[in-house]
């Protein structure tokens, strides 16, 4: 669809690669948030941008994806690496955001990702979260058909 720009943000949570997930991100532009880069290989993707403080990416990922442009941020920041990735996607014209690897794993991270999806939906941004075998769609009162 003309004018649509779907971005998939690779987050560091759990991921199960499924045919449905592959269809959902087909043709999407990809941004990795810190250790979310670990999912790039399993998905057969090379992100156009890698953001974060790189406190959890690990030296092997840093070497394997050395050619991917990076935006390094201080660990002492007021946003999560996922939020920074979403901000970049919006800056680059995202009309839809898929948060990949945003469920499962550490409960505080999953909760933060759910809150981020709600924030995006409240601002009119189309988004959802998937880890391949679980999905979450923010529903805002008065906006669901």
For the regions a protein language model found, what residue spans apply to each?
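Non-catalytic positions within long, well-ordered alpha-helices that form the structural scaffold/packing
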Residues: 41, 90-93
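Generic beta-sheet signal
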Residues: 33, 53, 73, 99, ...
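Short glycine/serine/threonine-rich phosphate/pyrophosphate-binding segments
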Residues: 17-19, 79-83, 106-111
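A glycine-rich helix N-cap at a beta->alpha junction
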Residues: 66-75, 124-128
């Amino acid at each position: 669809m003309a004018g649509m720009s779907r971005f998939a943000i690779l987050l560091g949570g759990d991921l199960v690669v499924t045919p449905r997930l592959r269809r959902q991100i087909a043709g999407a532009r990809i941004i990795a948030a810190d250790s979310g880069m670990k999912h790039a290989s399993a998905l057969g993707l090379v992100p156009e941008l890698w953001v974060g403080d790189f406190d959890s990416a690990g030296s092997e990922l840093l070497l394997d994806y050395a050619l991917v442009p990076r935006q390094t941020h201080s660990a002492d920041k007021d946003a999560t690496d996922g939020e920074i990735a979403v901000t970049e996607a919006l800056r680059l014209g995202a009309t839809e955001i898929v948060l990949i690897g945003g469920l499962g794993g550490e409960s505080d991270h999953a909760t933060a990702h759910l809150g981020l999806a709600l924030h995006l939906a409240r601002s009119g941004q189309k988004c959802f979260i998937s880890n391949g075998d679980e999905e979450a769609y923010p529903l805002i009162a008065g906006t669901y058909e």
